[in-house]
Amino acid sequence: MSSSSPAVDVRDLSKVFSRRKGLVHRRRRAALNSVSFTMHRGECVAILGQNGSGKSTLVRLLSTLLLADAGTAHVFGHDVFKEPRKVQRLVNRVSVEASFFKKMSAAENLAYAARFYGMGPRETHTKIPVILERVGFPSSRRGEAMENLSRGMQQKVALARALLTSPVLLLLDEPTTGLDPRSKQEVQTFIREIRHQHDSTILLCTHDMKEAEELADRIGLLDAGELLFIEPVEDVKERYGVETLEEAFFAATGRTYEDERTEDDEEREVFA
């Protein structure tokens, strides 16, 4: 693949979910509606949006967990929906809904993942403590069962697991949700290091505007499944004649992050 070719190429990607209401009627909601964008190797792109905007659906589609209803997506030249096994070897995903063996410890979960990725015992024994330390996971709790850890602690283990193989494309779905300020800063620092040391391409889906502005080269805004823009933050501010991303969100959507959501928004959140 040419170095000038996109790392991620999404064209008119759509996903519609149905939800039964009553005995017969099904309500259909578009979690994504004709979304298109590209990413270059080594780039970090942040997708902003409220809950239910379609961010998680986008991540699930690119990580081969869902099939699209329309459109195409390619990761380093491979068709996400026709060549899922090739794509899976290039992608690691961190999500707020990360699953673990709850009775096993953080170290045991990572060791299991390492074996799955084909890492040998010596490399596993060396790498796991280093990664856990880098994401700010305390050494005193590495042997503790996952079910006894807070959501924030589990999120750190999810990030560590995704970084075991130095992924080419890292899909981060709210990676710092549930973390205290210090842990959040540690994870953000580690994301920067991974990007620059391993030339990883990063898609960061978040509702944290400050996080997006600090970490990303370009910022996109998903609202009710529509990608309203995706461009450098200064271009976004200039486009709308504003000084902050929050003002840009208001200018683009006519509402603020704090506005009450409609029934349609709440129903869309079930899917997106």
Where in the sequence are the language-model features?
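Conserved ABC ATPase "signature" region
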Residues: 111, 115, 122-141
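Catalytic Walker B motif of ABC-type/P-loop ATPase nucleotide-binding domains
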Residues: 170-173
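Conserved catalytic motifs of ABC-family nucleotide-binding domains
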Residues: 166
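Helical segment within the ABC ATPase nucleotide-binding domain
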Residues: 185-197
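Conserved ABC ATPase signature
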Residues: 145-149
